Design a protein with these regions (language model features):
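C-terminal catalytic/acceptor-binding lobe
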Residues: 190-243
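A structural signal for well-ordered alpha-helical segments within the folded catalytic domains
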Residues: 4, 18-21, 25, 67-74, ...
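GT-A fold catalytic core of metal-dependent nucleotide-sugar glycosyltransferases
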Residues: 61-109, 113-118
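Conserved catalytic core of nucleotide-sugar-dependent glycosyltransferases
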Residues: 97-148
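Active-site-proximal specificity loops/subdomain of glycosyltransferases
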Residues: 39-65
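N-terminal anchoring/stem segment of glycosyltransferases
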Residues: 1-49, 157
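Catalytic core and acceptor-binding pocket of nucleotide-sugar-dependent glycosyltransferases
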Residues: 131-199
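Conserved small/polar residues in nucleotide/adenosyl-binding loops
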Residues: 254-261
């Protein structure tokens, strides 16, 4: 069983915004017997590896959180939630899994809500991937590869099919989008069903300029098939923000492999 523990991260020392306070209250309402643990500068080793140290020096809190959420789940087990995730009903049904999350779109694995048992092998693998990484590249630029990309890449290696259907990959169960993420990242609408347990509100404090531009552009590309709309928006956003050469470098194995799977 996954333990009744909710983890969240808050680095930088600023007060929690109103939405975060509201969401945490919803956790307490529907999960009253769960321990809630905040991870911050006081209880996490910011020198645990070069990636975390460099991300903290750059004040890129979201990328520190990418590591901390994995560390919390691997070492203690439980449910990790971003502070903009609202709980709609009890989460006990998630506790029976070895590890669980759900689709953020029809093709993307979200990281705003993830859960696993202590020591889950895939999550350990994902955590240790950061041990050999640097957040600051030799040329001074920052590696802003999201954990969505890293986790999706790892799952593709184990047979993940990006098609918004329930599946289990190396012990990691993925639920359809309506369970944990019924709010569309692209159009902002909420599509609740009887399955919906949480809403990720995408507050965007962590969102890069590239992601934010891609999100807005995606809303205008409705003439494109949904299966490729996000990829086109992300590529065009990279061109807009970073130039064509950088955009070409940013075309990830994740996007190519996912599109290939959808087309087959």
């Amino acid at each position: 069983m996954i333990p009744k523990k909710i983890h969240y991260c808050w680095f930088g020392g600023n007060p929690l915004p109103p939405l975060a306070v509201k969401c945490i209250e919803s956790w307490k309402k529907y999960c009253p017997d769960y321990e809630i643990k905040e991870w911050n500068e006081s209880n996490f080793d910011l020198n645990c590896n070069e990636y975390v140290r460099e991300a903290y020096e750059a004040k890129k809190w979201a990328f520190i959180t990418d590591v901390v959420r994995l560390y919390a789940m691997v070492t203690e087990g439980g449910i990790y939630m971003d502070t903009d995730v609202e709980v709609l009903r009890p989460l006990d049904d998630l506790l029976v899994y070895e590890a669980v999350s759900g689709f953020e779109t029809k093709t993307r694995i979200p990281t705003g809500l993830m859960a696993c048992r202590e020591g889950q092998p895939l999550f350990e693998e994902l955590l240790h991937e950061y041990d050999g990484l640097h957040f600051k590249r030799p040329d001074g630029s920052l590696d802003v590869t999201t954990n969505v990309t890293r986790i999706t890449n790892a799952c593709l290696k184990y047979g993940f099919v990006p098609n918004n259907t329930k599946q289990t990959v190396n012990g990691f169960t993925l639920l359809p989008q309506d369970y944990l993420c019924p709010k569309s990242y692209e159009d902002g609408k909420i599509y609740l069903t009887e399955n919906s347990m949480t809403i990720h509100h995408f507050a965007g404090s962590w969102v890069s300029d590239v992601d934010r531009y891609a999100q807005e552009l995606g809303k205008k590309l409705t003439f494109l098939p949904e299966s490729i709309r996000g990829y086109v928006a992300m590529f065009c956003s990279n061109v807009h923000c970073n130039g064509f050469a950088a955009a070409c470098k940013a075309v990830s194995y994740t996007h190519l492999r996912a599109h290939e799977t959808l087309m087959n």
